[in-house]
From Swiss-Prot:
Source organism of the structure: Anaeromyxobacter sp. (strain K)
GO BP terms, alphabetized: glutaminyl-tRNAGln biosynthesis via transamidation; regulation of translational fidelity; translation
Protein name: Aspartyl/glutamyl-tRNA(Asn/Gln) amidotransferase subunit C
Record's catalysed reaction(s): L-glutamyl-tRNA(Gln) + L-glutamine + ATP + H2O = L-glutaminyl-tRNA(Gln) + L-glutamate + ADP + phosphate + H(+); L-aspartyl-tRNA(Asn) + L-glutamine + ATP + H2O = L-asparaginyl-tRNA(Asn) + L-glutamate + ADP + phosphate + 2 H(+)
GO MF annotations in UniProt: asparaginyl-tRNA synthase (glutamine-hydrolyzing) activity; ATP binding; glutaminyl-tRNA synthase (glutamine-hydrolyzing) activity
UniProt keyword Transferase present: no
Role: Allows the formation of correctly charged Asn-tRNA(Asn) or Gln-tRNA(Gln) through the transamidation of misacylated Asp-tRNA(Asn) or Glu-tRNA(Gln) in organisms which lack either or both of asparaginyl-tRNA or glutaminyl-tRNA synthetases. The reaction takes place in the presence of glutamine and ATP through an activated phospho-Asp-tRNA(Asn) or phospho-Glu-tRNA(Gln).
Pfam families: GatC
The keyword Cell cycle belongs to this UniProt entry's keyword annotation: no
InterPro entries membership: Asp/Glu-ADT_sf_sub_c (IPR036113), GatC (IPR003837)
HAMAP family: GatC
Taxonomic classification: Bacteria, Pseudomonadati, Myxococcota, Myxococcia, Myxococcales
Amino acid sequence: MALSLEEVRRIAVLARLRLSEEEERTFAGQLSAILDHVRQLEELDVTAVEPMTHALAAGELPARREDAVFPSLTPEEATAAAPAREGTAFKVPRIIE
């Protein structure tokens, strides 16, 4: 089932998006494809699947490692490839007056 342009416009209003006519047509197709995929998922028989609260069971969680301290770059090394720097800091164009 394809989404109408009017439905896309309504979704855009709810999402506070301003879309061009071309974007409305593009999103209509993309959203329709997503909804078709969701409809296919709704048809799956999941009665034998046990509900889960996580993607992995509690015993399958990845092992945690201890934090380790590693040497880092000096400020000079970190800024060596910068197009502009001031001392040991990156120099960037002012964007706020």
